[in-house]
Design a protein with these regions (language model features):
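N-terminal (or domain-start) structured segment
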Residues: 24-116, 153-154, 161, 165, ...
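Short, low-complexity disordered leader/linker segments with a strong preference
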Residues: 1-30, 322-323
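A short C-terminal helix-loop "cap" of Rossmann-like NAD(P)-dependent dehydrogenase/epimerase domains
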Residues: 30, 57-61, 176, 231, ...
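An extracytoplasmic/periplasmic, membrane-proximal ligand-sensing/linker region
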Residues: 30-32, 174-178, 262-323
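Short coil/turn segments
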Residues: 40-42, 96-97, 128, 133-138, ...
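Hinge/capping helix and adjacent helix->loop/strand transition within the periplasmic-binding protein
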Residues: 80-89, 103-190, 239, 251-284
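A ligand-binding cleft/hinge motif common to bilobed small-molecule-binding domains
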Residues: 97-107, 170-175, 202-234, 312
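Short beta-strand/turn micro-motifs at beta-sheet edges
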Residues: 24-25, 116-120, 236, 240-245
């Protein structure tokens, strides 16, 4: 009586293991791959994922389908990936806050953590700006700060309290003792129209999203979240020039569910590496002011550890930790 269920369990486990190994075998991929993006269409993470998918399809010879799962500061998409079958057919292209949600527990409790994901590689480093409409009455960050000091409750747009955009605002507000109202959006795709429409006077969009609007004289940017000025926009000062600390920079990269086989991780990492070396891919990124800084799996895993430490120290200094 005991042997039947025992054998059933043994065969079931063998079958399950075979299915996962088969998925990662030499025939991978043999069907379309889904890439979850945790923000709405139109933002830098979405744009980067779609451009990568276009070039990855050429090498994988299978469709790479980008699916937007926005909401809850990116944790809806993050949880969807952590809960997906680890067979290599569901991946995620995530910003840093979605990749390591546990370090932002001061702002929310995520239903997963970075331990539920496997890093594959880093690809993009977004350039975040402090921007206003071109007809705004301020012509520099200094003028904006002076106005905000005299006018408490000024609205600043960002894309979630776990994001670098929000921390950029908090850095400014804390350093200058400003009383502001932060207004969260699901992503650049919804925040930028709100800025253009005058619903928020100040916002923190990524440069690659608003570059056409800067050139078209619809927006103006006062600063970038970088240690030094961006080569593509040398007239825009970096935050340290105003005396503000930049302890880390955000990133975007590929992730997979925790139990995804090594063969899949290696395959996707190798494909992405080749894509980032493609001159056409590089030229398209440059044209959109998207910075490509590829890191393979091993390097990205090490970087994540440093990133967590740096962010936690920064949040502690800013008083953004639970007591």
């Amino acid at each position: 009586m005991v042997k039947v269920p025992f054998l059933f369990i043994v065969f079931f486990l063998i079958g399950a293991c075979w299915a996962v190994v088969h998925a990662a075998g030499s025939g991978y991929p043999d069907r379309p791959i889904t890439v979850i993006v945790p923000v709405p269409p139109g933002g830098s993470t979405d744009i980067g994922a779609r451009l990568l998918a276009q070039f990855m399809e050429k090498q994988l010879r299978q469709p790479v389908v980008v699916v937007n799962r926005p909401g809850a500061a990116g944790t809806i998409g993050g949880y969807a990936l952590s809960s997906a079958k680890p067979d290599g057919y569901t991946l995620g292209y995530f910003p840093s806050s979605t990749a390591v949600p546990e370090i932002f527990s001061y702002f929310y409790s995520a239903p997963y953590s970075s331990s539920d994901l496997r890093p594959i590689c880093r690809v993009h480093v977004p350039i975040i700006t402090i921007s206003v409409k071109v007809d705004a009455p301020w012509n520099s960050l200094k003028e904006l700060v002076e106005f905000a000091r005299k006018n408490p409750s000024m609205k600043f747009g960002h894309i979630g309290k776990s994001t670098t955009q929000y921390l950029m605002i908090k850095t400014l507000a804390n350093a200058e003792n400003l009383r502001i109202v932060d207004v969260p959006f699901d992503g650049d795709g919804t925040m930028v129209p709100a800025l253009l429409g005058g619903h928020v006077p100040v916002a923190t969009p990524v440069l690659s999203v608003i570059k056409p609007m800067l050139e078209g004289k619809k927006l103006k940017a006062f600063s970038v979240w970088l240690q030094t000025r961006a080569p593509s926009v040398p007239d825009i000062p970096a935050m340290p020039e105003f005396g503000y600390k930049i302890p880390y920079v955000p990133f975007q990269g590929f992730y997979a569910p925790k139990e995804t086989p090594d063969e899949v991780i290696k395959k996707i990492d190798e494909v992405v590496r080749k894509v980032t070396e493609d001159k056409e891919f590089q030229d398209k990124n440059k044209a959109m002011d998207m910075v490509v800084e590829y890191e393979d799996t091993t390097l990205h895993e090490k970087y994540l550890l440093r990133y967590k430490t740096n962010v936690q120290v920064f949040l502690r200094e800013e008083g953004l930790v639970k007591k």
